[in-house]
Amino acid sequence: VGIVGAGPAGLLLSHLLHLAGIESVVLEARSRAHVQSRVRAGVLEQPTVDLLREVGLGARLDREGLPHHGLSLRFDRTDHRIALSELTGRCITVYGQQEVVKDLIAARLAAGGRIEFEVSDVALHDVGGDAPRISYTDADGHPAELRCDAIAGCDGSHGVSRATVPAGVRTEYQHAYPFAWLGILAKTPPSHEELIYTHHERGFALHSMRSPELTRLYLQVDPGEDIADWPDERIWSELHERLAVDGGFTLHEGPLLDRGITPMRSFVVEPMRYGRLFLAGDAAHIVPPTGAKGMNLAVADVRVLARALTALLTENR
């Protein structure tokens, strides 16, 4: 199986196929250092954690992940805690996407898996037949080709895979929301042990975290805002204003390691299969980061896709 994209979807699919005895090659346009440092979602739902443990990828997750048994909804300067574990028997775990990627890369390389980083000129051929091909230029500048039994397009919303499905076959649905998120990663301990989702007249705010030393915070802003207009002082002032609560709340400040503005949009393409090309993760659907669903949906996709490819390639069904 040729897999385009070394994000969580592509790497986990490669690992699942390996466990089923099916070889794969993962092609990635970026460097290993880049994909291992991309700050993305950090909330793993219980089925995602269960699967990672099931396939031997839970050791560091269990050591370093932060289980959350509830979350707070903050309205009118008052907290309303939702006791997730008490109500459902399950929890969420805070563990950065880049950490999941590190674990997956380490597992694939330890098993002798083939991941090619810094490839370019990727193109998919003959995906409508039984012998699809991927042509590309490798990291050393040499042209190369993979002959595959199937191709998994796990290269996100801007990759080549989705665009390879003919326009007359695919249907796209999208919606742009009239707001964006300004997100920061701050080198400071979290100000609260759980996530806080805040409703405020000036806009939404979210207190989250990536580790006991790193806090992730978000502000709802206009999609036309320029990050250059948001110096540290303005960001912290707005966070203090929106996260204020009766009874006292101390927002810990620290150096900003990352900042950016993300437009809120939803996108879905169908079908997710065309011939021997299968789309997964952001290549097939994008949801706003408001619910931290992106990586969890990608994991759910490849869990199903791995089973389907195993049936196709080992049982011809």
Regions from the language model: what does each represent?
Residues V4-L19, E23, L104, A152, ...:
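Conserved mid-domain beta->alpha element of the FAD-binding
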Residues H18-V39:
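Glycine-rich FAD pyrophosphate-binding loop
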Residues E23, G58, R114:
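Residue-level detector of anion-binding/catalytic polar loops
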Residues R30, S157, A283-A284:
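Conserved Walker B
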Residues H34, D155-G156, V287:
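Glycine-rich, N-terminal phosphate-binding loop of Rossmann-like dinucleotide-binding domains
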Residues Q36-R40, E45-A111, H125-G128:
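Active-site-adjacent segment of FAD-dependent monooxygenases/related oxidoreductases
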Residues A106, G113, F117-A123, V127-M264:
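Conserved FAD-binding catalytic core of PHBH/FMO-like flavoproteins
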